[in-house]
């Protein structure tokens, strides 16, 4: 079916998870909550925004589930709780987040876990930690990368073999639905990225091939970029992703 048919069968209600959730729709204990709400772009927001939305939002979503006796939650976290590193991470790896976003998502995971533990024999919690999610209409990292290549504004920052853990949005959704149907009570935690992960060069070259782009992408020394980021970042560069953390 086309997307138009899908949209016609949905009901959309504006809801701010930073406040108590009160929605005027029928809710039953058999409903399932998919908690996707988050402030996520890093950098791009004041530190407080990550904590206010991601932590308080988790508290309010879990309170809503508690109020109506909902037994199943699927929560999208992130690989950000692992911190910035390129060594292989498993679900058993100790999280060491080093950004407000990563810290807030790890705390949100724990809030959901506490909700499940209150009635561990009845409640089902699935936590997924996706990498960069891409797909039609995402207007995120991959979309910006494409337009950067097309406009001649993208370059390799210091190296071409930077690992970019990622997953296609429909693959992620299929996996979440599969686990929802094949998971009883308890807590499940999954990293959701392609393995082996792709390098930025592989992603760029694949994108160029798929779209017919003939652009040459050059590599700029990391030391030069770091100097520029330290200067430009405080002057408004963070809004464009130009800061030492991104380099």
Predicted segments, located by residue:
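Flexible, glycine-rich beta-alpha linker
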Residues: 82-83, 123-144
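Short alpha-helix in the Rossmann-fold core of NAD(P)-dependent oxidoreductases
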Residues: 53-58, 74-77, 104-105, 165
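NAD(P)H-binding glycine-rich loop region in Rossmannoid oxidoreductase-like domains
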Residues: 17-56, 60, 64-67, 82
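Substrate-positioning beta->alpha
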Residues: 138-144, 158-181, 187-191
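Short, small-residue-biased leader/transition segments that mark boundaries at the very start
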Residues: 2-7, 203
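Conserved Rossmann-fold NAD(P)-dependent oxidoreductase catalytic core, especially the SDR/UDP-sugar
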Residues: 60-100
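Mid/C-terminal beta-alpha module of Rossmann-like enzyme folds, strongest
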Residues: 178-245
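Active-site Tyr-X1-5-Lys
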Residues: 98-126
């Amino acid at each position: 079916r086309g997307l138009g048919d899908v949209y016609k069968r949905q009901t959309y209600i504006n809801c701010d998870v930073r406040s108590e959730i009160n929605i005027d729709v029928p809710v039953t204990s058999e409903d399932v909550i998919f908690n996707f709400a988050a402030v996520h772009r890093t950098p791009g927001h004041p530190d407080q925004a990550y904590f206010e939305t991601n932590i308080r939002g988790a508290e309010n979503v879990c309170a809503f589930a508690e109020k109506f006796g909902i037994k199943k939650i699927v929560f999208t976290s992130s690989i950000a709780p692992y911190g910035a590193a390129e060594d292989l991470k498993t679900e058993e790896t100790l999280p060491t987040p080093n950004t407000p976003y990563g810290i807030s998502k790890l705390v949100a995971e724990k809030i959901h876990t506490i909700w499940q533990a209150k009635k561990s024999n009845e409640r089902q919690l699935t936590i997924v930690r996706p990498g960069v999610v891409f797909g039609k209409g995402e207007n995120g990292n991959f979309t910006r990368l494409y337009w950067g290549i097309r406009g001649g504004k993208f370059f390799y920052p210091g190296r071409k073999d930077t690992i970019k853990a990622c997953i296609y949005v429909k693959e992620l959704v299929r996996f979440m639905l599969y686990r929802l149907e094949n998971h009883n009570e308890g807590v499940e935690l999954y990293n959701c990225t392609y393995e082996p992960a792709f390098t930025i060069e592989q992603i760029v070259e694949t994108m160029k091939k798929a779209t017919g782009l003939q652009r040459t992408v050059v590599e700029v020394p990391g030391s030069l970029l770091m100097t520029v980021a330290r200067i430009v970042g405080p002057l408004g560069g963070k809004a464009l992703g130009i800061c030492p953390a991104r380099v």
